[in-house]
Amino acid sequence: MKIKVLIVDDSALIRGVMREIINSQPDMEVVGVAPDPIAARELIKQTNPDVLTLDVEMPKMDGLEFLEKLMRLRPMPVVMVSSLTERGSEITMRALELGAVDFVTKPKMSIQSGMLEYTDLIADKIRIAARARIKPRTPHAQGGQSGTTLAAVRNPLTSSEKLIIIGASTGGTEAIKDFLMQLPPDSPGVLITQHMPEGFTRSFANRLDKLCKISVKEAEGGERVLPGHAYLAPGHSHLLLVRSGANYMTKLDQGPPVNRHRPSVDVLFNSAALTAGKNAVGVILTGMGKDGAAGMLEMKKAGGYNLAQDEASCVVFGMPKEAIAVGATHEVAPLHELPRRVLEFFAAHGERAMRV
């Protein structure tokens, strides 16, 4: 059975290019195209698509307004098509909160040739979306307890020496938000790699910073890693943990993609294994593929403690599944339980926080 795709975009050019890309794939087909959400509503009823691609900025009805109604009334996998503007990236973050599975950026230059170069990327995103676990959205759909912040870390030594190292991909923006919102202001320092293109990581970090008790920023490289702070890999670089004297520091590296990704979760996890050893706790969240599994195993070998998100709470159970398969994890738990388990581990092992 081919994946049935409905394209919603006000640009005839983009609709044509997307149709060409999707119909060129052996395992998917376009069952309808709509210039606006009003037309899309009828086509959804008629064609019953498996995946919807949705332009974030459209006339007649705002793409976000349409997405919110869709997720409430007929939840389905949606891939947003977004412009590379600051406004576009902010709207995209909101769309992911509302339940879109993923997004793909519109290329800047000559749109048609640029889009055709995106063929593999777009096709991959649609394949992943078709397999994604879509949950009806309620105001607190995902977060179990994301509204509650956990109690402060009891052992001050713990929070200054221990680190939380997080990797995620598809579905990860919401999972990371739900995880970080539970952390207390004196939580150990956090380093995060989320697969996301340049231009979107800053909007994501700014959004998290407004929502969380800890401070969240896009890593610039050279920052001292502090308790109560989270550092997000920028879309153009790998993020690494390094040491300078007694301090943990961030480092950016624009080396080639690893596992087809830059930033790569494996790069971050490998650096944590090397630099922090048993002071690091690794957390692998929802995402497609195997990025992070090998690095998480290195963290385990170096004495770190690792947790994976369970299948039921993942949008895509790929990266956690691979990490579990190679024997890299110590615990597997639902998303809403992971922050508590991490902090409980630190509380129980605080006296062992040691410089390496």
UniProtKB/Swiss-Prot annotation:
<dbReference type="InterPro" id="IPR000673">
    <property type="entry name" value="Sig_transdc_resp-reg_Me-estase"/>
</dbReference>
<dbReference type="InterPro" id="IPR011006">
    <property type="entry name" value="CheY-like_superfamily"/>
</dbReference>
<comment type="similarity">
    <text>Belongs to the CheB family.</text>
</comment>
<comment type="function">
    <text>Involved in chemotaxis. Part of a chemotaxis signal transduction system that modulates chemotaxis in response to various stimuli. Catalyzes the demethylation of specific methylglutamate residues introduced into the chemoreceptors (methyl-accepting chemotaxis proteins or MCP) by CheR. Also mediates the irreversible deamidation of specific glutamine residues to glutamic acid.</text>
</comment>
<dbReference type="GO" id="GO:0005737">
    <property type="term" value="C:cytoplasm"/>
</dbReference>
<dbReference type="GO" id="GO:0000156">
    <property type="term" value="F:phosphorelay response regulator activity"/>
</dbReference>
<feature type="modified residue" description="4-aspartylphosphate">
    <location>
        <position position="55"/>
    </location>
</feature>
<keyword id="KW-0963">Cytoplasm</keyword>
<feature type="active site">
    <location>
        <position position="195"/>
    </location>
</feature>
<protein>
    <recommendedName>
        <fullName>Protein-glutamate methylesterase/protein-glutamine glutaminase</fullName>
        <ecNumber>3.1.1.61</ecNumber>
        <ecNumber>3.5.1.44</ecNumber>
    </recommendedName>
</protein>
<feature type="domain" description="Response regulatory">
    <location>
        <begin position="4"/>
        <end position="121"/>
    </location>
</feature>
<feature type="active site">
    <location>
        <position position="291"/>
    </location>
</feature>
<keyword id="KW-0378">Hydrolase</keyword>
<dbReference type="Pfam" id="PF00072">
    <property type="entry name" value="Response_reg"/>
</dbReference>
<dbReference type="GO" id="GO:0050568">
    <property type="term" value="F:protein-glutamine glutaminase activity"/>
</dbReference>
<dbReference type="Pfam" id="PF01339">
    <property type="entry name" value="CheB_methylest"/>
</dbReference>
<feature type="active site">
    <location>
        <position position="169"/>
    </location>
</feature>
<feature type="domain" description="CheB-type methylesterase">
    <location>
        <begin position="156"/>
        <end position="349"/>
    </location>
</feature>
<dbReference type="InterPro" id="IPR035909">
    <property type="entry name" value="CheB_C"/>
</dbReference>
<dbReference type="InterPro" id="IPR001789">
    <property type="entry name" value="Sig_transdc_resp-reg_receiver"/>
</dbReference>
<keyword id="KW-0597">Phosphoprotein</keyword>
<dbReference type="GO" id="GO:0006935">
    <property type="term" value="P:chemotaxis"/>
</dbReference>
<dbReference type="GO" id="GO:0008984">
    <property type="term" value="F:protein-glutamate methylesterase activity"/>
</dbReference>
<dbReference type="InterPro" id="IPR008248">
    <property type="entry name" value="CheB-like"/>
</dbReference>
<keyword id="KW-0145">Chemotaxis</keyword>
